[in-house]
Amino acid sequence: MHLLPELASHHAVSIPELLVSRDERQARQHVWLKRHPVPLVSFTVVAPGPIKDSEVTRRIFNHGVTALRALAAKQGWQIQEQAALVSASGPEGMLSIAAPARDLKLATIELEHSHPLGRLWDIDVLTPEGDILSRRDYSLPPRRCLLCEQSAAVCARGKTHQLTDLLNRMEALLNDVDACNVN
């Protein structure tokens, strides 16, 4: 999988475009699962606001790809195929990994919790049958907001925080990781 260049579209995505993009991702996932009967990691960046493809989201994505590759190598799991693309919903990665789906999900949850950028990653694991393993399957609480300890979904629905504050926090986390050379 090639890392994405930083040049981004900065396209403000509409809700209908976002929904079409998600449907297209789901169709791609099913094609991949037919081609590789192993778990599929589908990876995106959590990007508040209408601009999903920016230099910041691409850099965050690239850190995530690097971390996922390192995780697979550390665990001795073979990546059978991997690809990166950019859709209306932002950067997307798919990795077919020969590993037990449950172990893979637990490892990606740990990665989301332990990596400084983990809260900005949405890492889904699909079983070879196409079932998405959820945080709820492991009795884990919902994602936390970037700015407070509330549920991210509650803050997003209630528009609790200014978009600029969320974007500034994302960029600060990214700059901290880059300054420390964390992968």
From Swiss-Prot:
InterPro entries: CitX. Its EC number is 2.7.7.61. It holds the Pfam family CitX. One of its GO terms (biological process) is prosthetic group biosynthetic process. It catalyses: apo-[citrate lyase ACP] + 2'-(5''-triphospho-alpha-D-ribosyl)-3'-dephospho-CoA = holo-[citrate lyase ACP] + diphosphate. Keywords: Nucleotidyltransferase, Transferase. Transmembrane segments: none annotated. GO terms for molecular function: holo-citrate lyase synthase activity. Transfers 2-(5''-triphosphoribosyl)-3'-dephosphocoenzyme-A on a serine residue to the apo-acyl carrier protein (gamma chain) of the citrate lyase to yield holo-acyl carrier protein. Belongs to the CitX family. This is Apo-citrate lyase phosphoribosyl-dephospho-CoA transferase. It comes from Escherichia coli (strain SMS-3-5 / SECEC).
